[in-house]
Amino acid sequence: MVIKTSLTVLILGVLIAEVFCAGHSQCNRRENPVNPFSYYETVNGKETLRMCPAAQIFNKTSCHCNAVEVVPGSGMNFRSGQQNFQWSSSGSSGGGMGASGMGANGMVASGIGASGIGTSGMGASNTNAMMNAFLGGSKAGSGNIATSGTSSGKFKVTLPFNPLILKWTKSSNGGWGAETGSSGGMNSQSSGSQSGSWGSSSGSWGGSSGSMGSSGNWLNDLQFMGNMRPQGINFPAPIMNIKVSGTGGSSQGVLRAARPHP
């Protein structure tokens, strides 16, 4: 009788434990080693790749996507050991980033040059480990990048988790386009951005009036959204979140980037 009672209690205990654990199962998600903005989820034995919401990365500890951290201070820092850089819209005669822009603050030794981008500004042999851009042209034309010079190239951003190449082509009005951008601008769609600029209809990286934010401010939250075909492959997830802040005109602005939590 005692054995029967003990066996009944044991069975009931196992059933209760199973019911309890069913609502508290282990995380059925795992991180994506290639892209922290996504994760793999297993449901009914089938594993599916899922994307986190914009500007969030998967946290294996919480088993959820969490917001990324905005790097404080000026410049852009992906923990590459390089100096942060700043840019300024002053010092350029025809648009572009200006003589007192990136070069003077740690991006490249010879800088962008007084005439805009410059042929030896962001060249292949004179960049740091964080950013490597291949841009042509003697100046930034009417405010766009490389309106004259080479018609194609690549913009390489080295992230701590995966090197990434964003291809660009010179479009009809000289912006950065993403493969087939028809109206210029570095955009999130392969068909071209709405206004030929980086998220601003009045300027900001290639507006008709000149350099960065020369007519209007730079308070734009921008994202590389993946259709920019890194390494020729559609990448259906945000790559990084960039905030450009400043007051417009010839004032100096600050480029800040989001990064994952350590």
Swiss-Prot record:
Tissue expression pattern: Component of the acid-insoluble and acid-soluble organic matrix of calcified layers of the shell (at protein level).
Compositionally biased region (Low complexity): 185-203
Subcellular location(s) of the protein: Secreted
Key word Transmembrane helix present: no
Residues carrying covalently attached carbohydrate according to the record: 59
Gene Ontology terms: cellular component: extracellular region
Residue segments, region Disordered: 172-212
Biased composition (Gly residues): 174-184
Keyword Secreted appears in the UniProt entry: yes
Keywords: Glycoprotein, Secreted, Signal
Span of the signal peptide: 1-21
Name of the protein in its database record: Glycine and serine-rich protein 1
